[in-house]
Amino acid sequence: MTLFQVYTRALRYLTVHKWRVAVVVIANVILAAITIAEPVLFGRIIDAISSGTNVTPILILWAGFGVFNTVAYVAVAREADRLAHGRRATLLTEAFGRIISMPLSWHHLRGTSNALHTLLRASETLFGLWLEFMRTHLATFVALVLLIPTAMAMDLRLSFVLIGLGIVYWFIGKWVMGRTKDGQASVEEHYHSVFAHVSDSISNVSVLHSYNRIEAETKALKSFTEKLLSAQYPVLDWWAFASALNRTASTVSMMIILVIGTVLVKNGELRVGDVIAFIGFANLLIGRLDQMRQFVTQIFEARAKLEDFFVLEDAVKEREEPGDARELSNVSGTVEFRNINFGFANTKQGVHDVSFTAKAGETVAIVGPTGAGKTTLINLLQRVYDPDSGQILIDGTDISTVTKNSLRNSIATVFQDAGLLNRSIRENIRLGRETATDAEVVEAAAAAAATDFIDSRINGYLTQVGERGNRLSGGERQRIAIARAILKNAPILVLDEATSALDVETEARVKAAVDALRKNRTTFIIAHRLSTVRDADLVLFLDQGRIIEKGTFDELTQRGGRFTSLLRTSGLLTEDEGQQPRPKAIAS
């Protein structure tokens, strides 16, 4: 993107407050135009002093002019600050909502730390651009447009010096931008690397402590920051050199104006006040040119940050639901997978030609070796991923034609990793249904056999669970997740190895709750417990993304196929296939 394209797209975010922004910008433009009168007034004061005429009226006018400028500037700056801060807050909220609504496949590909860093850096960059646009950008441009004609009206010869100075500034800026474009992009990449390393290390701090990696990770971060600085310093050097060149050009221009002005005054072609006024114009022009240089530098530095953010925003908008997506309602729970194919990029993993039907209220157990595609199948049902071909239907409705909100309202999921937020136990359970009363939360916790450990805490349901639930044991986290699903009361239930973190005693207590929860609900279980597989109406055995065997538990054990071999390998089935297997876990 060009600098102009980056700038105009950044300003489009202000259109939601277009009238307020317009008032602020127009006020700043008027102030910039009025400011041009200041050198003229000062020149008239010098002329009055040198000629011995009454200077008081002009002094009063100048003082009043200064007071008005100050008060007006404060009022305009205050409104600009409020607008910029407010828009930044709403942008963060809006962008966060769009990003977090993206499917997990997008987050896995993009990376959580990358998306977070891009959002935070972009919001700060946009804030700076908006603030400077309302305060100085347009006002600077207007002042430059008005300064030159006004100066030319006073004296054409001195005006050419100012025009030459402006051209020099432009060439220096263009030259330095060409020299630093790649370097600035490299700087932004290094910032992403630093942020990703910090985020990755902090989120896995327990592993780092366990393997005594603190010093090593700190050294690694130092290496990342050194690479960042090695990329940053050349860019800073070029802009420092540009600043020195601009300052030299400004000083030389002032000297030329003074020399020419002195000659013209001696020849009687100009008054001293005119020269003083022109020096004021030169100072104004230099100040505005410096602002313009800073503005261009700001846009230049912003481009690398904002281009990535705009790509992120475009990707999010491309994934937005079509306007004609309908609501999935009155779900009974019949689920059909019809010739489903899906593959992950650059791998052979996925699912291939999967077809089966789960009638309303049935329980489907999905078993198979690691990497067989069990979780992928469930993720397709929840539209974490969309299939490459085929259809998934709920009550005969293709789920690709319904809103994701209505689809997910129809499905309650208990993940292998409970996935708790750093909030209270009550808030985590209430994620299942935001409108649930405290009594309903307690009832759901009781059904999940969670009340004992909750009541044992000093703060009970107000206990903070910590980041990702790290203040609770694995079994405690899982029971909260089960309570959450119970509270949601959805017609379709997904249990992704939901009791894997529970001990035998706790599992026995939870099983009754899960069995009650499964009644009159279509349930999909990534199975790891024998009792769960035995109770299923349909068992799917997956291997390398394909359904190898399908049927009831008894049918598959009598068939003597891959499912039977898995049971025997796990020690769950003897050579006598009719013998009752021992209650152990199935490898998955």
Swiss-Prot record:
PROSITE patterns linked: ABC_TM1F, ABC_TRANSPORTER_1, ABC_TRANSPORTER_2, NDVA
Q: Enzyme group, top EC level?
A: translocase
What's the domain of life for this entry? Bacteria
Signal peptide interval: none
Domain ABC transmembrane type-1 spans what residues? 21-301
Gene Ontology molecular function: ABC-type beta-glucan transporter activity; ABC-type oligopeptide transporter activity; ATP binding; ATP hydrolysis activity
Membrane-topology annotation of the record? Multi-pass membrane protein
Q: Which UniProt keywords apply?
A: ATP-binding, Cell inner membrane, Cell membrane, Membrane, Nucleotide-binding, Sugar transport, Translocase, Transmembrane, Transmembrane helix, Transport
ABC transporter domain: residues covered: 335-569
The record lists the membrane-crossing segments as 22-42, 57-77, 136-156, 158-178, 248-268, 272-292
**Localization, UniProt:** Cell inner membrane
Q: What is its EC number?
A: 7.5.2.3
Principal subcellular localisation of the protein: membrane
Tell me the residue numbers annotated for binding ATP: 368-375
Q: Mind telling me which InterPro entries this protein's record contains?
A: AAA+_ATPase, ABC1_TM_dom, ABC1_TM_sf, ABC_transporter-like_ATP-bd, ABC_transporter-like_CS, NdvA, P-loop_NTPase, Type_1_exporter
The UniProt similarity line reads: Belongs to the ABC transporter superfamily. Beta-(1-->2)glucan exporter (TC 3.A.1.108.1) family.
Domains as described in the record: In NdvA the ATP-binding domain (NBD) and the transmembrane domain (TMD) are fused.
| Its biological purpose | Involved in beta-(1-->2)glucan export which is required for crown gall tumor formation. Transmembrane domains (TMD) form a pore in the inner membrane and the ATP-binding domain (NBD) is responsible for energy generation.
NCBIfam families on file? chvA, PRK13657.1
Assembly behavior: Homodimer.
Q: What is this protein called?
A: Beta-(1-->2)glucan export ATP-binding/permease protein NdvA
Give the species this sequence originates from: Agrobacterium fabrum (strain C58 / ATCC 33970) (Agrobacterium tumefaciens (strain C58))
Gene encoding the protein: ndvA
